[in-house]
Amino acid sequence: MKGPWLVLAALCLSLANLGPRGEDGLDFPEYDGEDRVIHISLKNYKAALKKYEVLALLYHEPIGDDKASQRQFEMEELILELAAQVLEDKGVGFGLVDSEDDAAVAKKLGLDEEDSIYVFKDDEMIEYDGEFSADTLVEFLLDVLEDPVEFIDGSHELAAFENLDDEPKLIGYFKNEDSEHYKAYEDAAEEFHPYIPFFATFDAKVAKTLTLKLNEIDYYEPFHDEPITIPSKPNSEKEIVDFLHQHKRPTLRKLRPDSMYETWEDDLNGIHIVAFAEEDDPDGYEFLQIIKEVAEDNTDNPDLSIIWIDPEDFPLLIPYWEEKFGIDLSRPHIGVVNVTDADSVWMDMDDEEDLPTVDELEDWIEDVLEGEVNTEDDDDDDDDDDDDDDDDDDDDDDDDDDDDDDDDDDDDDDDDDDDD
């Protein structure tokens, strides 16, 4: 979580109630002024962990003396206070840990990244790597409160499972909840909860529909219809965890508000292949289907990972992205972005009538992976432009010098005439 995101989030909070009052049932919560966020110290951290089913801690850098730093911290606190108010009856607590004043308790709890939120539930610690806004944080914590494994008992639950295609998911078929193999599956689910959904069924008909054998676990990449079966069933917790770590970077993944920083930091050699497409837009939807087909065709390529961003999920970032990348987000785009300096190169799609075909997109991606398309080339072009500008300046200087010499000669001639 970075400073600008906090400012935008707080702005959203302040603007939420500027409109006319809604009817009963549609009123957004307003902060009631009660202090619920606690300062965590060596004296009270154990009591706080026992008191709350879920405890969310903001590990922050020391507050600066300047007005801007203090104002920003106040906005961060406001976000936490509103979230704490909304989730008060759910058994969720919120706290603050200063990285300097509370270094001892931070070390005991394993907090190491400033401006991050750490969530504690049972014996698990989850780092929240999403947008710092009250609504996104509340949604994430409600997911944390859910059980790590969701059961599929019939056709309706099965349909919901099949419709979930924009994030990785697992499903296993077990004898019952008392099965040792299910227990291992459940323990693995707790380690990835709530970022990766785990499903289980004890129903033979559901298992048959999914072509699952007893104690078998299938893993689905995002946007893939065909699963990968975890080998060597029945699987231990370690085998499941190791498998997911090996497959942690899907071929195509969606940038989501609740995990956006984690996704962005997981780059390949300092770059991301980024696709912008609005799913609700006809062109965006068509382009997304092309990208999905390319991803499924290349699912075995460990060097390929595409991040899909639906601009509608991040409306406050649209002007920034358009200015930074020099693209119009009302149209689909795919390009290479350097994660260090955000330099980018975008696939040429000037023809508004035709989107690239699957083959054309695969050829472009192949050029990217082979290094023929990269952001350094764009830098070289900029350098060439600068060199051209310098040459022009030199030419202008030479011309000016020549003009000055001519003027001097004219002056000398005039002086000679005067002497005569």
Swiss-Prot record:
The lineage of its organism: Eukaryota, Metazoa, Chordata, Craniata, Vertebrata. Residues 1-22 form the signal peptide. Keywords: Calcium, Endoplasmic reticulum, Glycoprotein, Membrane, Metal-binding, Mitochondrion, Muscle protein, Sarcoplasmic reticulum, Signal. Monomer; increases in response to a depletion of intracellular calcium. Homodimer. Homotetramer and homopolymer. Can form linear homooligomers. Ca(2+) ions promote oligomerization. It comes from Pelophylax lessonae. It is a peripheral membrane protein. GO terms for molecular function: calcium ion binding; identical protein binding. Glycans are attached at N338. It comes from the Eukaryota. Its main location: endoplasmic reticulum. The keyword Transport does not apply. This is Calsequestrin-1. Detected in skeletal muscle (at protein level). Detected in skeletal muscle. GO terms for cellular component: endoplasmic reticulum; mitochondrial matrix; sarcoplasmic reticulum lumen; sarcoplasmic reticulum membrane; Z disc. Gene3D superfamilies: Glutaredoxin. GO terms for biological process: positive regulation of release of sequestered calcium ion into cytosol; positive regulation of store-operated calcium channel activity; regulation of skeletal muscle contraction by regulation of release of sequestered calcium ion; regulation of store-operated calcium entry. Belongs to the calsequestrin family. Residues 369-420 are annotated as: Disordered. Calsequestrin is a high-capacity, moderate affinity, calcium-binding protein and thus acts as an internal calcium store in muscle. Calcium ions are bound by clusters of acidic residues at the protein surface, often at the interface between subunits. Can bind around 80 Ca(2+) ions. Regulates the release of lumenal Ca(2+) via the calcium release channel RYR1; this plays an important role in triggering muscle contraction. Negatively regulates store-operated Ca(2+) entry (SOCE) activity. It is found in: Endoplasmic reticulum; Sarcoplasmic reticulum; Sarcoplasmic reticulum lumen; Sarcoplasmic reticulum membrane.
